[in-house]
Amino acid sequence: MKQALAFVVAVALVGGAWFVRTEFIAPTDDPGGTDPAEDVAEQPVTGLAVACDAVLGTACPAGSARLGSQALVDAFSTPDVAHDVLVAPTVVVEMIEESGRSTTTLSDDRRVVATSPIVLVVASGRETDVMDCGPTWTCASSLVTTGDLRPAFADPSTDTEGIAGVAALAGGYFAEAGAPFNLTGFSTGGFIGWLDAVQRESTVSPSGVENIIRFAGSQNDSAVVTEAEALDVTGRAAQNVPVILYPEPVASLAVVAVAVGDADPDDARDVGEQVGAQLRDAGWRGPDGASADGGPAVGEDDGLPSGGVLVALRQRWEQ
């Protein structure tokens, strides 16, 4: 009897979750997302062994190995790297090169094929708190550490979007503290206390924006994600539509395709053009960073620290 009751409850919970998702947020044919596990499609289209950052979702070429940024660092640290082309944001390329573990060379030909700012999505009604003091990442950082803003990130330990989101907030902290955003700054008591507060007040979730909509901000009232994801999810919301903010300085992810080892850079360029077209169709901006929706333009500087600093920030997050 207890087992039967447990089954009924489980079915009810699953059904309720499905109802909330379909009632509040229209479904999409492209889940995108940031699956950190390897996802190899069945039909390669390039004839090349491509490693693709999972933050790019289904824009990754068919047949590519879709990996989170930490898994990419690991994949390029093995004695025999199994990939001809790497498609990822420039910061991930830097993380591989500056990790101290890379076992191969990556081409210097790195043409940007698509960009997306890092944005702060907040539950409707909460945007006033951020707008009143900026909006800046310093303001957002302060609101998080005082418990007045409860953001969600994709997992910073594995995911590009997650570690970039934490880095954007950390940049706000260092700007206010007047301290350098580097390894030296990470060892200060002020930063350690700040990071502890952020981890305490935040939620790790691949569905931060969706959760704002589903639970009307009661679980997390904000999320730090790419603009492309924010526009997609909020555009499908039927109610509890959150607000997209662009704190300054604007941080962004710029996607490149680079040849690995002695692979032909022209082949990497062809892959990049294919991925770039897919990303732009999915709501990413073009290489120039211009916005078609009234958002601020993205400059040449991505507003993020170097790859080596991001590797160290990830290590601090995991401690």
Language-model features: locations:
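Sec/Tat-exported extracytoplasmic proteins
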Residues: 87-90, 122-124, 155, 172-177, ...
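Ligand-binding pocket segment of bilobal, Venus flytrap-like solute-binding proteins
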Residues: 174-247
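N-terminal segment of the mature folded domain
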Residues: 29-158
